[in-house]
């Protein structure tokens, strides 16, 4: 990822944290996204580096694609086990990504802290360009994604 230019485009404040988390952990909302990293703070801070080590699996169990990253579907049950219970986590950060055919990468960060949940988009270009169509398309797709799942949010400036 070194050398990529990261653009942060939109920040959405999610109105219903509980509803969003149900989509995330019990639904399939993010299942196809790759998980670059995850950090959850409860009584301790837990980290996940999303790199998948295929050598760990048997040959008939190969789990990753060319990205070398795990998918959210592979990890959500594991992460949910850290947070289920009577107390909410102090902090959570999820860094999801989607690889484009042209080599660019769209990202979504989910940031939770102090009862506030934010959905933040980003875009990394494989090569420097003044062209912003890919970034705008990613933004538009993310907004449609939120709308499709009927998530109520407020766009922050």
Model-derived segments and spans:
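Surface-exposed, low-hydrophobicity interaction/linker segments
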Residues: 62-116
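Short amphipathic alpha-helical segments
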Residues: 1-12, 147-157
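Charge-rich, low-complexity N-terminal segments
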Residues: 2-72
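Generic structural hydrophobic/aromatic packing signal, biased to beta-strands
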Residues: 21, 35, 94-96, 110, ...
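Generic "edge-of-domain/loop-turn" microfeature
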Residues: 34, 40, 53, 101-103, ...
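Mixed-charge, glycine-accented linear interaction segment located at domain edges/termini
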Residues: 121-157
């Amino acid at each position: 990822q070194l050398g990529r230019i990261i653009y942060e485009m939109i920040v959405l404040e999610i109105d219903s944290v509980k509803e969003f988390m149900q989509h995330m952990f019990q639904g399939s909302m993010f299942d196809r996204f790759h998980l670059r990293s995850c950090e959850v703070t409860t009584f301790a801070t837990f980290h996940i580096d999303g790199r998948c080590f295929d050598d760990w699996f048997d040959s008939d169990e190969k789990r990753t694609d060319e990205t070398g990253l795990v998918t959210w579907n592979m990890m959500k049950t594991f992460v949910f086990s850290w947070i289920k219970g009577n107390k909410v986590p102090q902090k959570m950060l999820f860094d999801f990504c989607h690889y484009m055919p042209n080599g660019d990468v769209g990202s979504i960060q989910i940031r939770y802290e102090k009862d506030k949940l934010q959905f933040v988009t980003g875009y990394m270009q494989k090569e420097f360009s003044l062209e912003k169509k890919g970034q705008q398309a990613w933004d538009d797709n993310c907004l449609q994604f939120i709308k499709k799942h009927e998530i109520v949010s407020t766009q922050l400036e």
